[in-house]
Amino acid sequence: MLSGAYLRVLNERPGQAVLWSLGCQRGSASSTEGNRCVEAAEACTADEQCQQLRSEYVAQCLGRAGWRGPGSCVRSRCRRALRRFFARGPPALTHALLFCGCEGPACAERRRQTFAPACAFSGPQLAPPSCLKPLDRCERSRRCRPRLFAFQASCAPAPGSRDGCPEEGGPRCLRAYAGLVGTVVTPNYLDNVSARVAPWCGCEASGNRREECEAFRKLFTRNPCLDGAIQAFDSSQPSVLQDQWNPYQNAGCCFLWVSSMSILTALALQALL
């Protein structure tokens, strides 16, 4: 069930949507209240397009379709599915999953695991490679290079501007960051005690290109423009998700329209919440 709320079919007709009732008890509070990452996951599950794209990357990154054998995933398939998720999914919902704010380690760990880091991010190696390796691959890639340039143009500090960041760059910065997910420089949250993000790489073994390596990594780890854009989105997230709820609701009950064809997949995805 959706985070402890009871689920009831109010109306169902073949080929039409189903109106589900979520926790319709006057005065009762959802167990997800205050956990924006769970709220974002539930909102995605309730949206047919978001849920379908999410189930696709789950299948490729975590399911049998995306794994060669124990401990070995087909990373190219996983990353392709992630690119499709952000390219075709509703930005309000995909970004809510990516940038949801957390106040505790349990929420932060759920957020860190949302986009299958064992396959899409870090892989089986114990130590991260030099950032120069994925950076060089990205700059040679027709798919990755323009995405990285867009991220640099939209998120890199701009000393000449009013606040030191690109003008009105917050939403563009988040879109550009999301565009990197599924590339060879896929970023993710680094731990469950902070909101630090970076690709899976370091600069310890960078030789005489250490400065170049550090400059690239600091675009993620020490970037006030990226940090500010994420914080601004987190502040607006409740109103963003509110727009996804069906207008047929009252003070004690909220409803979601869910395709009858997506019910089983939606319930299966609850394990990821």
UniProtKB/Swiss-Prot annotation:
Q: What is the effect of changing W257R?
A: In 50% of the molecules
The source's domain of life comes to: Eukaryota
GO CC: one term?
Answer: receptor complex
Biological process (GO), any one? nervous system development
Q: Which residues are glycosylated?
A: N192
Tissues expressing the protein: Weakly expressed in heart, brain and testis.
The entry sums up its family as follows:
Belongs to the GDNFR family.
Put simply, this protein is called GDNF family receptor alpha-4
